[in-house]
């Protein structure tokens, strides 16, 4: 039978519940347990697919095509277990399910209410499909006290009563702020947060307390006394250099031991921390460093590129170098010469994005990389802009553009209206809904055997995750290839271009998919490992 760990947050948002959940899952895995993590998001959107990156950050796409919270990316990177549609739920999805049931008459004329109908739907989500797991970790989004989170907190309160005794543990993540004028950390915000949590019927078993310095024993005793938590269960969560130091730090503080003790598991299997120690050692002892320019349009919020950032660091791990990121807003290149910004970097990456803003700047970045022989990695939109650049400057199609930006006589990039998903033909209308209508999830691509990208993968058959509505127009393939841009990867039916590259360039690759979503610290994605390797070679020339 699965045991459940419910993780809530208090005082302020963005304390790192997702990292805490992922780190705890990794620690339990290190002891040989089978672990699943689920995220419960209180917002009313059905999923984050149509939300602004500035509001939500990255949309993490799973193999089965779910558009989910970026925390699921942390879950995958820390545990290696691929997430799916059933690992993330939102209030919007809960309400949609309930309304559909009500319209079908499933409630037999009952008045549909938050309790029991909404809470039952949440509980069903938490409990479903856990037969093969020893532990299920559930992160509750938001902060205790948020009105949107109340149904979720009520649902996990009920689960604490309904599950067999000893199979549910509550962890509350809080903040102890340091007040310079007083010269001390303050416990009061945590006390009030726990008071709020207890007022709705949840008594935390463990306090995970964020702080920027060591928490004195006297403060831990104080929190234990006023929050009614064992002193050993007041665990400090200090700031660390990288997120991959968190599992080691939490293990040293005894988080995993305290969780197992709360479940009455004693003695517990000893953890194997060697691979985490190896990752930490490599991160803190690089043998060199490279600088990568990221030319994007959401650079004001780095969370919009969370998986991309981590995948670049994984590429650094594979090559034992530190990867420095130079963030450049693409629109800058529409006003200024790109050369002063890009001459000293060792690689240029143009990530995914939507819309016309910044597109010309990304095209200029691709042109600079092609002409100056600087390693270039174009992902999704970045591949599309590289193709438009080639069409304009190598083929001579001056009006080459994307239909995403408006009507154009030369749609080198166009809207996909149909594509194969397995044996099914997916169709989309230009005037259809935006949410959940893109080409989403894992799709197969076939690579040319003699291509650079096939050599990097060590295979001609790959499966990668996609999230796009527009695609390079196959009608321009022959002219682009004649100009030197090799279409090295295609969909199995030969209709959708998946990868492009230049044979006469040290490293210039564009991919329509998002390889960053499948990179792990222990298994860096081969494209990112190869890109950083090329950047190392470039660093010797700059």
Swiss-Prot record:
Q: Which GO terms describe its molecular function?
A: ATP binding; CTP synthase activity; glutaminase activity; identical protein binding; metal ion binding
Please name every pair of cysteines joined by a disulfide bond in this record: none
- Documented EC number(s): 6.3.4.2
Positions of CTP binding:
13, 146-148, 186-191, 222
GO biological process terms, semicolon-separated: 'de novo' CTP biosynthetic process; pyrimidine nucleobase biosynthetic process
**In which domain of life is the source organism classified?**
Bacteria
UniProt binding sites for UTP: 13, 186-191, 222
Query: Where, by residue number, does the polypeptide cross the bilayer?
Result: none
Q: Which UniProt keywords apply?
A: ATP-binding, Glutamine amidotransferase, Ligase, Magnesium, Metal-binding, Nucleotide-binding, Pyrimidine biosynthesis
Give the residue ranges for region: Amidoligase domain: 1-265
Q: Which residues bind ATP?
A: 14-19, 71
State any further remark: CTPSs have evolved a hybrid strategy for distinguishing between UTP and CTP. The overlapping regions of the product feedback inhibitory and substrate sites recognize a common feature in both compounds, the triphosphate moiety. To differentiate isosteric substrate and product pyrimidine rings, an additional pocket far from the expected kinase/ligase catalytic site, specifically recognizes the cytosine and ribose portions of the product inhibitor.
What's the stated role of this polypeptide?
Answer: Catalyzes the ATP-dependent amination of UTP to CTP with either L-glutamine or ammonia as the source of nitrogen. Regulates intracellular CTP levels through interactions with the four ribonucleotide triphosphates.
Record protein name field: CTP synthase
Q: Which organism is it from?
A: Brucella abortus (strain S19)
Q: What is the lineage of its organism?
A: Bacteria, Pseudomonadati, Pseudomonadota, Alphaproteobacteria, Hyphomicrobiales
Q: Which gene encodes it?
A: pyrG
